[in-house]
Amino acid sequence: MKQIKVISIFGTRPEAIKMAPLVRRLNENKNVESKVCVTAQHRQMLDQVLNLFDINPDFDLNIMKTKQTLTGITARVLEGLDKIFADENPDIVLVHGDTTTTFAAALAAFYKKIAVGHVEAGLRTYNKYFPFPEEMNRKLTGAVADLHFAPTLGSKKNLLREAVNEKNIFITGNTVVDAMNHTVEKDYVFENDELNKLDYKNKKVIMVTAHRRENWGKGIENICTALRRIAEENEDVEIVYLVHLNPVVKDVVYNNLNGMKGVHLLPPLDTKETHNLMNKCFMVMTDSGGLQEEAPHLGKPVLVLRDVTERPEAVEAGTVKLVGTDIKKIVDEAYKIMKDEEEYEKMSKAINPYGDGKASDRIVDAILYHFGVLKDRPDEFSPKK
């Protein structure tokens, strides 16, 4: 039987982290001819992940430019993929999540009448500008996708409400849990020596990331003010803020927090360093989507610095709390976790609703099932009670 030709396409670090374990599984399957195309929407951060998981792309569009616009990214991805799809004629294209690469790649495949598989399908806030542009990227990708790999039952329900055919939806769990089984080590020694010097046993190390567009300006200012207050009022706290390289974020953070006692401003870490810092820290504050899924796997409470989330499962499970960017709310909720052992225990022991480390296997099986290689529909992910 002819192999199924699959091209996996991604362009940013979060996409690469979540697609890497799937690419490995595709490469191992004798029924699949697996190829990888990167757009390099975020060049440096993407390359770190490719090296970590030993992935050598077959195609590299290398579209990144300084001060790139969403329109520019979309146009360059569409143009670059047009020729690749014409030459390769894959059976299916796999895209991930909600980046501009995701939407543009799905659209390019649709124009060539190539099937689209959407990994991490069905996440919704139902507000097209929060997060921007991710909410519309994933909705539009869902509109052209043929196979929808929903990480949770909630994601599947969102797709059903949008009239997606149930037979094309597969609940797989999230591939990020698969990735973390590869990256987290018990006695990890950091490459960044500043992280090795932190006292994780006797200090409350708070890991922070905040960079989303909807938080630019006033949102980041408020987050910094809250962090300053927490650092000033608590000698047993060390804040590690992984500061995004974008000057819109970086300049505000450094103006507010640089040189403060108990605050460590570091550039974004590679995936392995990030996952192991998360594993050692006390709690996480973030506006990142990925960290909302990763931290529960490691039993870390998360304060989400956003007003809405497309990942309500962790909120329902009790491991994540939405606090937005209100200064008082951030400080109050942080203190609740820091000073109330029962609250900390409740959040850290919550069931992880996002995966069991087998999402990539389920996605490969779903593809084989769709193309008639497997007769039986694969089993779906369900969180352990």
From Swiss-Prot:
GO terms for biological process: lipopolysaccharide biosynthetic process. It comes from the Bacteria. Signal peptide: none annotated. GO terms for molecular function: UDP-N-acetylglucosamine 2-epimerase activity. Its EC number is 5.1.3.14. GO terms for cellular component: cytoplasm. It is found in: Cytoplasm. Keywords: Cytoplasm, Isomerase, Lipopolysaccharide biosynthesis. It catalyses: UDP-N-acetyl-alpha-D-glucosamine = UDP-N-acetyl-alpha-D-mannosamine. Pfam families: Epimerase_2. Its main location: cytoplasm. InterPro entries: UDP_GlcNAc_Epimerase_2_dom (IPR003331), WecB-like (IPR029767). CDD domains: GTB_UDP-GlcNAc_2-Epimerase. NCBIfam families: wecB. Belongs to the UDP-N-acetylglucosamine 2-epimerase family. This is Putative UDP-N-acetylglucosamine 2-epimerase. It comes from Clostridium acetobutylicum (strain ATCC 824 / DSM 792 / JCM 1419 / IAM 19013 / LMG 5710 / NBRC 13948 / NRRL B-527 / VKM B-1787 / 2291 / W).
